[in-house]
């Protein structure tokens, strides 16, 4: 369905607009964070006093969440839109669910058919749990291996591929009835600063930005993405004042809306992030972003009431025209109309919610993606199928397998090496070294470079087949020539461990390709 193509029902939205006060309208622009930790009564107060437009779900248990949403929606005169940052599906906020692969693993797939299916399956899950908006996918081009915040959230380092794969995921989710948001405009891939902590700078000229950062966003717009999320970035070529992109009129209104032709909803990245919240008093940030052209103001810093009041005051004082306010509120109401939220109070059935969401079809699809994305970087000297295969050697004891502990120490690595000593081949599974907050040292008593050095030395003493259950950038840190074989499984979840096991046992072939250039190997490489 084309964005905002809702037949004759627009009359209802116009009637609502005419009846709404400035306070009613401004409240619809704000989406506030909710989690199991949210104090009782806090959201109720914001619904009653500030008339907020929606919530973003952080973390909760599914049945508790469903009951809370049902109770809260009953109190909202205009039903709230429920949103989520669910880049790898509902499991990102409801951790009892099986996790969909991250975008970089999807980027290892050879075509987009399966990516569309992933989008549809994600949408089915979101709709079952009453989520209307997913702030995904990331269409940033991750062409900087040192990027601390995007990494596996990107489809890769090729803008054309990122655009193509992002469009497939968007199509799948939107066809499934869920609003999606291409992010982080104008592009967060080639940065070495996390915008949660500071303001990153993109120092490139306009020609480079058009060819790399902006390309996937333009393609998403051409493919009718319904929402674009603006990130917190300093882009001098687009706005020489140094204003963060989320507060920049030249970037949001002149570039995104006018030049690139985006007619949908512009949503901010979280406005409490330090990439923007330290730029001015926190309660002034939402107002500045709205003046710049944003439509929906996501997760302002804790001064929620003051933030909303400041926008109301600006409208009443004439700093913001009533027409400008109506323009954004109209978009929000039309979105709610398309979602059926204006037809009555929504209800999330808590009964069998887990069983309905974690279906066999979803689990099978996730395994199918994991199987299809395994990437052979260096084919082992031993055959993977037939007589004398690696699987036969493992059964006879001539080859042994070991899974390294995430909380690695020199002692644990020495122990792992000793456990396979004497074997002709050692199959070593290297887990993710990524901690929840991107603190690479949290899982280990050793620095990553020490771990990679140990493994490279080990490979010089024994035929080591390395299964990298992490992103491909590990290839930049190891001596590829030292290893007898290298395969990439992208993460340590059970489905990926199983998929790599299938490849090494000869049950399936490795069909994935490198989604990024790494280890001196090009994007799209696979060892056939």
Identify the meaning behind each predicted range:
Residues 4-46, 258, 280-528:
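Preference for extracellular/luminal or secreted protein segments
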Residues 21, 55, 63-80, 84, ...:
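Second-shell residues forming the walls of enzyme active-site clefts
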Residues 29-38, 103-117, 198-212, 272-280:
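Active-site mouth loops of central-metabolism enzymes
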Residues 34-38, 82-92, 132-142, 182-188, ...:
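Short glycine-enriched loops at secondary-structure junctions
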Residues 44-58, 120-134:
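Catalytic domains of carbohydrate-active enzymes, especially glycoside hydrolases
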Residues 109-131, 138-154, 159, 166, ...:
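A substrate-binding/cap region within the structured catalytic cores of diverse enzymes
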């Amino acid at each position: 369905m084309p964005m905002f193509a809702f037949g004759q029902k627009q009359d209802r939205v116009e009637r609502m607009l005419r009846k709404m006060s400035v306070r009613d309208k401004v409240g619809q622009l704000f989406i506030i964070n909710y989690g199991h930790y949210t104090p009782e009564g806090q959201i109720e107060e914001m619904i009653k006093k500030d008339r907020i437009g929606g919530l973003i779900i952080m973390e909760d248990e599914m049945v508790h969440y469903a009951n809370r949403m049902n109770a809260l929606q009953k109190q909202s005169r205009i039903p709230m839109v429920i949103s989520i940052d669910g880049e790898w599906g509902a499991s990102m906020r409801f951790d009892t669910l099986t996790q969909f692969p991250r975008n970089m693993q999807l980027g290892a797939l050879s075509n987009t058919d399966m990516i569309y299916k992933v989008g549809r399956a994600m949408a089915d899950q979101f709709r079952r749990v009453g989520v209307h908006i997913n702030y995904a996918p990331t269409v940033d081009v991750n062409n900087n291996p040192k990027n601390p915040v995007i990494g596996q959230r990107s489809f890769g380092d090729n803008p054309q591929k990122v655009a193509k794969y992002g469009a497939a995921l968007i199509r799948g989710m939107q066809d499934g009835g869920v609003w999606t948001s291409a992010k982080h405009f104008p592009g967060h891939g080639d940065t070495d600063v996390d915008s949660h902590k500071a303001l990153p700078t993109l120092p490139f000229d306009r020609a480079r930005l058009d060819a790399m950062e902006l390309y996937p966003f333009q393609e998403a717009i051409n493919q009718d993405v319904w929402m674009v999320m603006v990130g917190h970035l300093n882009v001098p070529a687009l706005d020489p004042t140094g204003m963060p992109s989320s507060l920049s009129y030249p970037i949001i209104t002149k570039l995104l809306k006018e030049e690139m032709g985006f007619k949908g909803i512009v949503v901010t990245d979280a406005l409490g992030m330090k990439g923007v919240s330290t730029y001015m008093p926190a309660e002034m940030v939402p107002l500045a972003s709205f003046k710049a052209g944003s439509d929906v103001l996501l997760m302002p810093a804790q001064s929620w009431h003051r933030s909303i009041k400041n926008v109301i005051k600006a409208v009443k004082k004439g700093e913001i025209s009533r027409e400008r306010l109506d323009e954004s509120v109209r978009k929000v109401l039309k979105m709610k109309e398309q979602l059926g939220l204006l037809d009555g109070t929504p209800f999330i059935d808590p009964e069998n919610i887990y069983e309905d969401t974690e279906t066999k079809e979803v689990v099978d699809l996730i395994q199918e993606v994991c199987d299809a994305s395994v990437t052979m970087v260096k084919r082992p000297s031993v055959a993977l199928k037939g007589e004398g295969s690696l699987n036969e050697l493992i059964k006879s004891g001539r080859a042994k397998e070991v899974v390294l502990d995430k909380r690695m120490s020199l002692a644990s690595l020495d122990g792992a090496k000793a456990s396979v000593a004497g074997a002709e081949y050692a199959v070593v599974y290297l887990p993710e070294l990524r901690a929840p907050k991107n603190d690479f040292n949290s899982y280990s008593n050793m620095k990553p470079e020490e771990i990679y050095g140990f493994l490279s030395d080990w490979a010089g003493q024994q035929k080591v087949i390395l299964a990298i259950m992490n992103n491909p950038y590990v290839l930049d840190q190891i001596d590829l020539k030292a290893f007898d074989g290298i395969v990439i499984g992208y993460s340590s979840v059970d489905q990926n461990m199983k998929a790599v096991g299938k490849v090494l046992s000869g049950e399936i072939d490795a069909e994935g390709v490198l989604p990024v250039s790494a280890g001196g190997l090009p994007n799209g490489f696979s060892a056939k």
